[in-house]
């Protein structure tokens, strides 16, 4: 089964394409695709046939058909939203592209055509607040969350919505926000693969917070916050993305400042996190990804223009450094997938 990696290079106006050896984690360059306008956030359609790209320097969202034999990209559509998207995702059906706008203070839903191409005006263009940093629907595809960081006027809150998968409309849930302790700054989040739990990375708080998710009401309640930093570290740091292993046994979050990947073991019963340590990585790791099986992890340094690779210990979750690859200027997103059946 072919494993592919897409790395957006915002300051090179390119997307780099790699294949990964499933046994060794070795990456092999497959070429670069010119993408104007500062490509940054990436998202994949559920059928893995379309890649969606957010443009940061010239606001836009584009769709690219994926060649399943080569991983190559062919642009199929583009739209120009009112602001530059910070985050993209699709709903669980793949009929809609959802986007969050950090500086634009909005969340949006865009329709896609039968071939997955973007085009036309948004179905929803909702004013939220400065600092909107992510948006995803829950596994039932009936609720959505938009975390807002605690910086530059951000409200330091998670906005809760109901989502209509028939129309694509977002409606504020009750309550509409989940407030945070001062200095937390929820940024990105991931779902537990088999439990009603969510985990948010906290940008300003340099921490991860676990939440119980009520699948009937679509609301969240926190049960744990744990630091992503080692004891005694007091220098400047912000937390970026977050990802859980497909098995649900380990969770990872990068530190920008400490320049490390923090690892956590996930309790099989309660979902509570226990720190398992840190591994040094490239400077300012804004983006990272596990491979689809959770055997390897790749972290991009947006200040070094390199990508560091690690092997994941399946028993402990510990990361063993492997190779470092030059990728291009300002890597801002790492997306891994397989294109097999």
Model-derived regions, located:
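An edge-strand/N-cap motif at the start of beta-rich repeat modules
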Residues: 1-22
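Structural signal for beta-propeller blades
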Residues: 14-15, 59-61, 105-107, 153-158, ...
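Short loop/turn segments immediately following beta-strands, especially the blade-tip
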Residues: 18-25, 64-71, 110-118, 161-170, ...
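Loop-centered beta-sheet repeat module
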Residues: 145-207
